[in-house]
Amino acid sequence: MSQIAILSVNHQLVPVEVREKVAFTPDKLIQALNNLHHIDGIDACIILSTCNRVEIYVASNHKNSEELLSNYLAKTHNIKRDIIDSYLNYFEGNEALTHLCNVATGLDSLVLGEPQILGQLKNAYHIAKEVKTLNKLLEKLFQHTFSTAKKVRTNTQIGASPVSIAYCAVKLSEKIFEQLSEQTVLLIGAGEMIELCAHYLNQKGVNKMIVANRTIENAKKIAHLYQAQSIGLKQFSSFVYKADIIISSTAASMPIIGKGLIESALKKRKHKPIFMLDIAIPRDIEPEVGQLDDVYLYTIDDLGQVVNDNIGNREKEKGLAQEIIVKQNQVFNKWLDTIPNEQMVQSYQFGANSIKNELLEKAIKQLKNGANSEDTIRKLADQLANKLLHLPFKNIKQTSIENLSQCEGCIPYIKN
């Protein structure tokens, strides 16, 4: 019998530079699915690949699929196992079921409760369905997951309140500028927070973003995801005047943006307002910058209370979401328990049909040879009943008294 197994590479453990090494690009995903599906013992598979996670879901006949899936991932991307081994998470059975539901509901996301992941999961499911790498078990698993996610969204407020500093930054910028899509944004840094800011700004329709970082390659990684421009940190001062929004989050030990730089930028901009958010500790922007007219400067302390309030709200909802997941998974596990019964029924049905066809052929030949119709039909009925009942009768005779009531339940015409 197949069992559910998951190999996960996600944001909780894995830096961007490793995640991108194991990502499946759209042009290679279908071939990757087919290759995985052709591995002996893999009955079905789905691959999810986003900027924050790569996950492989399989219905496998192997007792443990961790080594197999880890080797597949390394071989597919032509990388050594020791590069990724410490970043891999493996789940099977009920743990796999819980993990997938946590992913679908946003409980496992970088931003607690974010809804985008459900759409990404549905897309991965549909791709697997199109290339025929699904079976009944994975079909049922993902339909259960989507239903559970919908129930969580309907019955909790897990996605209602923004929780990340990045999200709050974007919401604050909307108060300054009515149309974010028309603004130019300068993002300074290339860490997790800047990546999230880029994500939310992109969702708001911002298509003019500049990512500046000391290591240009790290800036390019984020810029590539959102079709932004990437520059080195030494260059950013010449781009400041172009920015309507500046969000900075570096690891610099001293401020990198001073009052003089912003004064010059404002003159070039003819005092068009600049929204600035400093989410670095120590601060990246000199506090004196906030004294300038047409500058709206916020620090992480200004956002702290908003974020903490929303984290509290979502943490409460997280508990409710987990309760729903547990209850829904109990229903799914009951269905899993019936699979051996279904297989037994299918096997018995196949055997019964074989017996029926064999006896029917004999009866037809007898009728063609002139045998009496009524006698032939009666003989067919008797033989069919005897052959079909032989094995059940044998098993009933060998069944203990304690289990006899279960046998009676399978024979509705028994009279008490």
UniProtKB/Swiss-Prot annotation:
Site annotation (Important for activity) points to: 99
Give residues annotated as binding NADP(+).
189-194
Record carries keyword Electron transport: no
According to its UniProt record, which residues of this chain constitute the active site?
51 (nucleophile)
Q: Which UniProt keywords apply?
A: NADP, Oxidoreductase, Porphyrin biosynthesis
| Entry GO MF terms | glutamyl-tRNA reductase activity; NADP binding
Assigned EC number: 1.2.1.70
- Source domain of life: Bacteria
Q: Which reaction does it catalyse?
A: (S)-4-amino-5-oxopentanoate + tRNA(Glu) + NADP(+) = L-glutamyl-tRNA(Glu) + NADPH + H(+)
> Which pathway is recorded for this entry?
Porphyrin-containing compound metabolism; protoporphyrin-IX biosynthesis; 5-aminolevulinate from L-glutamyl-tRNA(Glu): step 1/2
InterPro entries the record matches: 4pyrrol_synth_GluRdtase (IPR000343), 4pyrrol_synth_GluRdtase_dimer (IPR015896), 4pyrrol_synth_GluRdtase_N (IPR015895), GluRdtase_CS (IPR018214), GluRdtase_dimer_dom_sf (IPR036453), GluRdtase_N_sf (IPR036343), NAD(P)-bd_dom_sf (IPR036291), Shikm_DH/Glu-tRNA_Rdtase (IPR006151)
Record keyword NADP present: yes
Which Gene Ontology terms describe the biological processes this protein takes part in?
A: protoporphyrinogen IX biosynthetic process from glutamate
Its top-level enzyme class, in one word, is oxidoreductase
Annotated positions binding substrate: 50-53, 109, 114-116, 120
Instruction: Give the protein's function.
Output: Catalyzes the NADPH-dependent reduction of glutamyl-tRNA(Glu) to glutamate 1-semialdehyde (GSA).
What does the record note on quaternary structure? Homodimer.
What else does UniProt say about it?
During catalysis, the active site Cys acts as a nucleophile attacking the alpha-carbonyl group of tRNA-bound glutamate with the formation of a thioester intermediate between enzyme and glutamate, and the concomitant release of tRNA(Glu). The thioester intermediate is finally reduced by direct hydride transfer from NADPH, to form the product GSA.
Q: What is known of its domains?
A: Possesses an unusual extended V-shaped dimeric structure with each monomer consisting of three distinct domains arranged along a curved 'spinal' alpha-helix. The N-terminal catalytic domain specifically recognizes the glutamate moiety of the substrate. The second domain is the NADPH-binding domain, and the third C-terminal domain is responsible for dimerization.
Similarity field: Belongs to the glutamyl-tRNA reductase family.
> What protein am I looking at?
Glutamyl-tRNA reductase
Tell me the lineage of the source organism: Bacteria, Pseudomonadati, Pseudomonadota, Gammaproteobacteria, Candidatus Pseudothioglobaceae
